[in-house]
Each structure stands twice: as structure tokens, then as C-alpha cells.
């Protein structure tokens, strides 16, 4: 499964790790498919660290109105550029904000749920070109989620909150 994040600087293509972290990927895919991320800005950009987006307020303080638990997998590490992870305010506070790294960031392991990776160097070049306040135009999801009743119920509950 892939996510194609179309920005004003180009498209970032990412592999999503549904098999390892199905809840985190399902949350992201649901928000993307609803258009939640469309026209949001990259509100936090730190050279030689990461780019962050997903805040509906554009300040880093907003989210979808719900939180969910961290989801870590032993095989997923912040050991290279282009790692896609959830931003959070501490354990169990994942929502809609995410970041993509410029470099390896091992101190983030087991603190931020990794759920994807840029596909190639061209995608990383787009990541590296993003500046503060650049925008996501839209996110396209390529592929289908495996059906999981427990996760489907969580998505249904989240959508009730999002539909308010």
C-alpha cells in the first residue's frame, strides 16, 4: 500500500506498513481518504531533522478530536532518512499529525509510531525541498486495507467524531 502526498513542491510517494502497524496506517488512510489533510500546511520544518504536518489549525496544537495508542514494531526504526511517523505529545496521544525525517533519528524509536517510508531518492528530494508553510494539496492512497473488524469499529468511532 502506498500514499502519494501531492504538495506544492512535488509528490512524495511512501510505502505504508499496514502489516506491522495496522491501526496507525488505518487512521492515516481514513483521514487521507476523507480529504482531512487537503490544503494543510507543513507547520513545523526543521533542517536536518524533519517536516511535520497534519494540524488543521496550522499551529501544531490541533488534531482530529480523538487520540489513539502508540503502535511500535521491532523491525521499524528511525534509522534512515524518509521515515514516516506519527507526531505526538506523549504516549497514547496520536491523532492526525505526522512527520517525515531528513536523517536518521534513533532517539525517536519507541516514542513515535513509524508507519511508512519514502519510496526512493526522488521522493526524499521532495521531502528535503519542503519549507515552512508549504502545503499538502491532496493525498492519494494506492491499494486497499485488509479488513479487520476491530480496526473497522475504531474507524467508525473516529468518523463519528470527525463528522460532528
Set out the residue ranges of the language-model regions.
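Cyclophilin-like peptidyl-prolyl cis-trans isomerases
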Residues: 1-164
Amino acid at each position: 500500500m502506498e500514499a502519494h502526498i501531492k504538495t506544492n513542491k512535488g509528490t512524495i510517494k511512501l510505502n505504508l506498513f499496514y502489516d506491522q502497524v495496522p491501526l496507525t496506517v488505518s487512521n492515516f488512510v481514513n483521514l487521507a481518504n476523507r480529504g482531512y489533510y487537503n490544503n494543510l500546511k507543513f507547520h513545523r520544518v526543521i533542517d536536518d531533522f524533519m517536516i511535520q504536518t497534519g494540524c488543521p489549525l496550522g499551529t501544531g496544537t490541533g488534531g482530529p478530536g480523538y487520540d489513539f495508542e502508540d503502535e511500535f514494531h521491532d523491525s521499524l526504526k528511525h534509522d534512515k532518512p524518509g521515515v514516516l511517523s506519527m507526531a505526538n505529545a506523549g504516549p497514547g496521544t496520536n491523532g492526525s499529525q505526522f512527520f517525515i525525517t531528513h536523517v536518521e533519528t534513533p532517539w525517536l524509536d519507541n516514542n513515535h509510531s513509524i508507519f511508512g517510508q519514502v519510496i526512493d531518492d526522488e521522493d526524499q528530494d521532495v521531502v528535503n525541498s519542503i519549507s515552512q508553510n508549504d502545503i499538502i494539496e491532496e493525498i492519494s492512497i494506492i491499494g486497499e486495507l485488509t479488513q479487520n473488524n476491530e480496526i473497522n469499529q475504531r474507524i467508525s468511532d473516529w468518523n463519528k467524531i470527525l463528522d460532528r
